[in-house]
Amino acid sequence: MADFLGMMKQAAQLQSKMKAMQAELDQIEVEGLSGGGLVKVRMSAKMEVRGISIDPSLIKADEREVLEDLLVAAHGDAHRKAEAAMQEKMQALTGGLGLPPGLGLG
């Protein structure tokens, strides 16, 4: 019975820490780049796009397809960085709990 109560207490603590981590992830911002920095996407570690910056040289009718490709690439770069930031926070939170890797608690 004591083991069960201990596990319940640990689960409650983990839930509290997860809430705090979600707030921290919202504060972390990463920037994805493409085209040598001509296109930038800012994203929170919660995968929310915060902003997009496009170099004026790309805003031409004949550059539309290039711009679209660069936007996709910059978003992908930002997404990878946000995922890495989230994984780092998750590892810090769950590192001592012996949970299986990749367990999505977020």
From Swiss-Prot:
In terms of superkingdom, the source organism counts as: Bacteria
Q: Which SUPFAM superfamilies match?
A: YbaB-like
Q: Which organism is it from?
A: Rhodopseudomonas palustris (strain TIE-1)
Outline the subunit composition.
Answer: Homodimer.
Where does this polypeptide localize? Cytoplasm, Nucleoid
HAMAP family cross-referenced by the UniProt entry: DNA_YbaB_EbfC (MF_00274)
In the UniProt record, which is one GO cellular component term?
bacterial nucleoid
Q: What is its main location?
A: cytoplasm
What does the function comment of this entry state? Binds to DNA and alters its conformation. May be involved in regulation of gene expression, nucleoid organization and DNA protection.
| Record keywords | Cytoplasm, DNA-binding
Recorded GO terms, molecular function?
DNA binding
Official protein name in the record: Nucleoid-associated protein Rpal_0620
Which family, according to the similarity comment?
Answer: Belongs to the YbaB/EbfC family.
